[in-house]
């Protein structure tokens, strides 16, 4: 059985002077690319789960304001749809405001253990409130109090006052009402790139771009 399935270290093939991954990461889609990149995304995430990647859905999401000034942060992919990936935030946060001004965004999944990357590009669309209600109730209830009292990205003037307000809400049994600004965005993908650490620095890069006729794929030089 391939060592990557068992999560055992495999030195040699995937080693690089600049990358520290030690788990063999199969990339069968590079030789026979499927027509739909979302199936590749599902496959990679499932393999990452099997080999024990610590945070496989931690997406470094880059947004930009109306003047093109970028900002980045980590969000968690909560769901994969047929057209993109979903994550939750607060509408009044910096990313929420920027996505309202400029919906184009780019995200990267980087898995150090296997030296793999997935680059996701597209436009963010705010989902209906019903989706936000669903996402809110899926969160651990212990996260509700602070998420309810916080006005994400606004200046924090009194740490203890905010802590006390959250502790007061924590006395409530069960879920709290969803805060008005809590929302879900879908990053509807226009392109994806799957990157694998290859032999002799011939890294394996498989890119998909959406077109009027559907998805088109091509291999890129390292």
From Swiss-Prot:
The gene is phzD. Binds 1 FMN per subunit. Pfam families: PNP_phzG_C (PF10590), PNPOx_N (PF01243). Its cofactor is FMN. It catalyses: (1R,6R)-1,4,5,5a,6,9-hexahydrophenazine-1,6-dicarboxylate + O2 = (1R,10aS)-1,4,10,10a-tetrahydrophenazine-1,6-dicarboxylate + H2O2; (1R,10aS)-1,4,10,10a-tetrahydrophenazine-1,6-dicarboxylate + O2 = (5aS)-5,5a-dihydrophenazine-1,6-dicarboxylate + H2O2; (1R,10aS)-1,4,10,10a-tetrahydrophenazine-1-carboxylate + O2 = (10aS)-10,10a-dihydrophenazine-1-carboxylate + H2O2; (1R)-1,4,5,10-tetrahydrophenazine-1-carboxylate + O2 = (10aS)-10,10a-dihydrophenazine-1-carboxylate + H2O2. Keywords: Antibiotic biosynthesis, Flavoprotein, FMN, Oxidoreductase, Virulence. GO terms for molecular function: FMN binding; pyridoxamine phosphate oxidase activity. Involved in the biosynthesis of the antibiotic phenazine, a nitrogen-containing heterocyclic molecule having important roles in virulence, competition and biological control. Catalyzes several oxidations in the terminal steps of core phenazine biosynthesis. It oxidizes both hexahydrophenazine-1,6-dicarboxylic acid (HHPDC) and tetrahydrophenazine-1-carboxylic acid (THPCA) and thereby contributes to the generation of both phenazine-1,6-dicarboxylic acid (PDC) and phenazine-1-carboxylic acid (PCA). Pathway: Antibiotic biosynthesis; phenazine biosynthesis. The keyword Oxidoreductase applies. Its EC number is 1.10.3.16. This is Dihydrophenazinedicarboxylate synthase. GO terms for biological process: phenazine biosynthetic process; pyridoxine biosynthetic process.
């Amino acid at each position: 059985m391939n060592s990557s399935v068992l999560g055992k270290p495999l030195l040699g093939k995937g080693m690089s002077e600049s990358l520290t991954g030690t788990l063999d990461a199969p990339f069968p889609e590079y030789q026979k690319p499927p027509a739909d990149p979302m199936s590749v995304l599902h496959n990679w995430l499932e393999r990452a789960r099997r080999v024990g990647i610590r945070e496989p859905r931690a997406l470094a999401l880059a947004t930009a304001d109306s003047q093109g000034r970028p900002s980045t942060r980590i969000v968690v992919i909560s769901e994969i749809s047929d057209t993109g990936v979903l994550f939750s935030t607060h509408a009044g946060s910096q990313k929420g405001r920027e996505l309202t001004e400029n919906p184009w965004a780019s995200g990267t999944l980087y898995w150090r253990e296997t030296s793999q990357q997935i680059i996701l590009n597209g436009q963010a669309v705010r989902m209906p409130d019903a989706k936000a209600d669903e996402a809110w109730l899926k969160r651990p209830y212990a996260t509700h109090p602070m998420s309810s009292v916080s006005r994400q990205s606004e200046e924090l003037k009194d740490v203890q006052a905010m802590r006390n307000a959250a502790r007061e809400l924590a006395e409530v049994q069960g879920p709290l009402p969803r805060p008005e600004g809590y929302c879900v965005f879908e990053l509807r993908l226009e392109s994806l790139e799957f990157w694998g650490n290859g032999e002799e620095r011939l890294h394996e890069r498989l890119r998909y771009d959406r077109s009027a006729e559907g998805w088109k794929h091509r291999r890129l030089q390292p």
